[in-house]
Amino acid sequence: MKMTAIAKASLALGILATGTITSLHQTVNASEHKAKYENVTKDIFDLRDYYSGASKELKNVTGYRYSKGGKHYLIFDKNRKFTRVQIFGKDIERFKARKNPGLDIFVVKEAENRNGTVFSYGGVTKKNQDAYYDYINAPRFQIKRDEGDGIATYGRVHYIYKEEISLKELDFKLRQYLIQNFDLYKKFPKDSKIKVIMKDGGYYTFELNKKLQTNRMSDVIDGRNIEKIEANIR
């Protein structure tokens, strides 16, 4: 009888211990799932807020170069309103002079100090060398969207007004259009991408599940040589 009682007690303790462990394991999994969900949700909100936000363009302005702490900047003064743009890659060599006139800037505000100076990344191009009365290129823009029961395809054109255009400007304007017209960031975009295809067969890709990398915001391409643009929303 004693052995039976001991066995029963051991079994009960084992069930209780196992139950506690299982419950704890489930709680940990639930917490991890919640944290992951909250992070994904925050990522979507951050992307949607950024690409739904305001942008501005400064035309035919002069950028004054300075460097500090290994970083390189151009300062623009437009009617006593200052914009500081951090530059990367080839722009560091392109704009080595202290004074760089004849520039167009695509600005998205990353921050602003107490004096009203706006901080931005890249988006610097040289102004058009020829005169144009309208757009200079109108590549086909094809949008494919997963709509549950299949893939729907839509088409339009995307007008280009610059001989030089930054990846920053292309990325921002294309995503903003998709947000406004195709519910981009209504859910997490997973493997969604935009592909800008050039006439020579080269291409540039924007991954829609993250913000364009800051160093790529300085990259510039010839707007006249864009063949077509494709977006896949999944």
UniProtKB/Swiss-Prot annotation:
Residues 1-30 form the signal peptide. The keyword Signal applies. GO terms for cellular component: extracellular region. Belongs to the staphylococcal/streptococcal toxin family. Interacts with host SELPLG; this interaction prevents SELPLG-mediated neutrophil rolling. Interacts with host MMP9 (via sialic acid-containing O-glycans); this interaction inhibits MMP9 activity. Interacts with host GP1BA and GP6; these interactions play an important role in platelet binding and activation. InterPro entries: Enterotoxin (IPR008992), SSL_OB (IPR015282), Staph/Strept_toxin_CS (IPR006126), Staph_exotoxin (IPR008375), SuperAg_toxin_C (IPR016091), Superantigen_bac (IPR013307), Toxin_b-grasp_Staph/Strep (IPR006123). This is Staphylococcal superantigen-like 5. It comes from the Bacteria. Keywords: Signal. Secreted protein that plays a role in the inhibition of host innate immune system. Modulates the interaction between host SELPLG and P-selectin thereby preventing initial rolling of neutrophils toward the site of infection. Interferes with leukocyte trafficking by inhibiting host metalloproteinase-9/MMP9 activity. Also associates with two different platelet surface receptors GP1A and GP6 leading to platelet activation and aggregation. The gene is ssl5. Transmembrane segments: none annotated. Induction: Induced by Sae and repressed by Agr. The keyword Glycoprotein does not apply. It comes from Staphylococcus aureus (strain Newman). NCBIfam families: PRK13035.1.
